């Protein structure tokens, strides 16, 4: 007999607003993403100083995950399946700027570490102590059927008890 799975929660962060299960839960007038992210972080009353060192993509994925995993049980085996269109291009461009000029060559390790899109999964995993399956995919659009099939595989084969799927797109402060 085939098991039925369902979406238990959703989170959308867009245009300085956060929606959980289609209900507006936070709004800010901060147009700049970093200022908006900081306001959202403070609203959640978190104590996780590493947040302020993250790139935009990681902050976006981290904040959405906070809204979705706030009631997580420590024993939950939650897989993470994230996707976007631009991978880590926003951070890649910042890194390129730091190494472009031979006379002013100052690559930043703090930026370089975020030049892989899957680092945002690592940030969420560390925060929530997840030692689970994870994958980050890049495609033009969210591939619903692919993600559904992947999530079903993980659940049906006891690779995970739950799966957090997400589209986390961040480029030039657009999210």
Residue ranges and their predicted role:
Residues 1-149, 153-160, 164-175:
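Conserved "HGTGT" condensation-loop signature of ketosynthase/thiolase-family condensing enzymes
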